[in-house]
Design a protein with these regions (language model features):
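Membrane-interface alpha helices of multi-pass inner-membrane proteins
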Residues: 108-124, 160-161
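Membrane-interface transmembrane helices that cradle and orient dolichyl/undecaprenyl
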Residues: 45-53, 89-109, 217-226
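Short acidic/glycine- and proline-prone juxtamembrane loop motifs at membrane-interface regions
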Residues: 68-82
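Loop-to-helix entry region of an early transmembrane alpha helix in multi-pass inner-membrane enzymes
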Residues: 5-9, 18-35, 72, 76
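Short helix- or helix-capping micro-motifs
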Residues: 56-67, 91, 117, 121, ...
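Transmembrane-helix motifs of polytopic, lipid-linked glycan transferases
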Residues: 27-50, 88, 92
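Transmembrane-lumen/periplasm boundary regions of multi-pass, lipid-linked membrane glycan transferases
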Residues: 119, 130-227
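Specific aromatic-rich, kink-prone transmembrane helix
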Residues: 39-42, 62, 81-100, 116-117
Length: 228
């Protein structure tokens, strides 16, 4: 109950094709990784206006070198589907802003990005951080980058809530157990403040390790390691 159900729903479909538990566990992360790499290559091709095999290979290697992606696409966590959907949503957002004055195509990519984000939110609750960040940026930079009208933003919000109906309905009928777990039980001080701090510290160390290549490359770009 601590995660929305989309990953479980998709995995249940695999049951119709194979009863091999190892296949069931590995097939979805593998397919998701394939989708991400394909989108990455298409994105690279779109920016370069041609298929650059060298740049595409570098992009794939850099992606796989980031521990958090290697971990989540090797183990059957809900995160592999979350990453795939948000990656696809990001690409659609890129296409939305790149379409210039072609209003019809722009709206097509905007709503497709919203739809993919809604599915990501149906995979893990922390997808809301992506959506909140995108919305905050669009509202803050609206005069400079344009973006959807307030009417389309409201329509998109309604669309997101409609897609989350299964989660909302289940929580209403189960005393909001998912939200209670994330907002109360995980931070329950009866477990001890030291335990909460210990878990938070361990989480931060895990984040530093998981994103270590990004931090190192950023430091190098700022000439922190210019003498090494």
């Amino acid at each position: 109950f601590d995660h929305p159900p989309l990953t479980t729903w998709v995995q249940s479909i695999i049951l119709y094709f194979s009863d091999n538990k190892y296949f069931q566990i590995k097939v979805l992360p593998s397919i998701s990784l394939g989708f991400v790499l394909i989108i990455m290559i298409i994105w690279q091709q779109y920016i370069s206006k041609r298929l650059d095999y060298n740049q595409s290979l570098k992009s794939v290697i850099l992606f796989l070198a980031v521990p958090i992606y290697a971990i989540f696409f090797c183990i059957s966590f809900p995160d592999f589907l979350l990453i795939t959907l948000l990656f696809a949503s990001s690409f659609c957002l890129f296409l939305y802003f790149d379409r210039g004055n072609n209003r019809i195509k722009r709206l097509y990519y905007w709503y497709f990005a919203v739809f993919l984000f809604s599915l990501a939110l149906l995979t893990k609750y922390n997808a809301i951080l992506f959506g909140a960040g995108v919305l905050a940026y669009i509202l803050y930079k609206k005069k400079d980058i344009g973006g959807p009208s307030y009417g389309h933003i409201i329509a998109s919000t309604i669309m997101i809530f409609i897609i989350q109906t299964p989660v909302l309905f289940w929580n209403v009928n189960n005393d909001f157990v998912s939200f209670s777990f994330h907002l109360n039980e995980r931070l329950d001080q009866s477990n001890g403040v030291l335990l909460i701090l210990k878990n938070a510290f361990g989480f931060l160390l895990g984040v530093l390790f998981a994103f270590s290549p990004i931090f190192i490359l950023n430091l190098r770009s700022n000439n922190f390691f210019k003498n090494y």
